[in-house]
């Protein structure tokens, strides 16, 4: 599927705090811990626990969330299909949408029981 400017803007204006519990509920149902969830978010965004909780309390949008993030340099290694969108085919002009889908992919992998070493991608040496 193709990302549109309207879709990108809709996601950009969503409140992270309203989506966070949906992510967590999914992971909890699959027996994952909040620590694992936050480890994945920290790897991807650079947000420690305090910063993450402040962003949730401040009800920031996904736009602000990703503007403040320091996306991991290996994030480009997150590939695959999420909600019908192939991450690596999302155009550069929709980077925010791509980052949202990358984070969802990490959460999907965690929910499916993938090992943390595989989720937190490392360059092969």
For the regions a protein language model found, what residue spans apply to each?
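A charge-rich, low-complexity, intrinsically flexible signal that marks solvent-exposed coils, linkers
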Residues: 1-125
